[in-house]
């Protein structure tokens, strides 16, 4: 079943952010056809890579009230207590942070972890070290979002650029209501996504575990 899920995901339509790259590859391939040049193969390979990289499969969030889901596909590379990004104004009290590394083979669409309202979005320029390193959370270019949930608590999701990824896209604004599993952005070509849980919550996952964005439950809100 997992194999068929992977095949179905790889055939998913591309995210709109990938269209310029896909069109560029197709134009290069057509130009290669016109001039009888090896450019056709380069264009086709680039197009196929972009179709795979920007794939955007549908996801079904769990029907469990209070379930906090993974904001991205990938592998958990770090877990621990850490203060959320200061630009969000959530205080300096450490809370559980779950860091997910997205390789170039993972789906790169970011999804909302829980129902709520976006209260703050803050972009910070920075470095571009490998997103698999722990220092990427504090050193790299990032886009941080604070989301207030029904209980009044706030969680944070941080889109982090990587060594190759140099473009972070976010499709929501401050004040927008959001739903669990809803698409809200994408990071191009390898990246990291951090999730800061509300105060007092502990993750239900483990370091090294593979996440499915919008579906894997990372934690549950207290009743």
Residue ranges, per PLM feature:
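Contiguous, well-folded functional domains in the mature portion of proteins
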Residues: 1-223
């Amino acid at each position: 079943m997992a194999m068929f899920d992977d095949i179905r995901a790889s055939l998913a339509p591309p995210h709109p952010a990938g269209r310029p790259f896909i069109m560029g590859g197709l134009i290069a391939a057509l130009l290669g056809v016109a001039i009888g040049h090896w450019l056709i193969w380069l264009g086709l390979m680039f197009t196929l890579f972009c179709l795979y990289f920007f794939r955007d499969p549908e996801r079904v969030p769990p029907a469990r009230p209070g379930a906090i889901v993974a904001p991205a596909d990938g592998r958990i590379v770090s877990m621990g207590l850490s203060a959320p990004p200061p630009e969000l104004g959530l205080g300096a009290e450490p809370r559980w942070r779950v860091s997910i590394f997205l390789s170039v083979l993972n789906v790169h669409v970011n999804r909302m972890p829980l129902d709520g309202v976006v209260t703050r979005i803050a972009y910070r320029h920075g470095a571009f070290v490998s997103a698999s390193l722990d220092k990427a959370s504090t050193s790299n270019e990032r886009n941080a979002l604070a989301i207030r949930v029904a209980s009044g608590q706030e969680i944070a999701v941080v889109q982090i650029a990587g060594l190759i990824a140099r473009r972070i896209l976010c499709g929501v604004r401050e004040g927008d209501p959001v739903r669990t599993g809803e698409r809200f952005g994408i990071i191009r070509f390898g990246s990291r996504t951090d999730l800061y849980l509300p105060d007092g919550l502990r993750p239900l996952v483990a370091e090294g575990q593979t996440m499915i964005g919008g579906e894997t439950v990372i934690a549950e809100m207290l009743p």
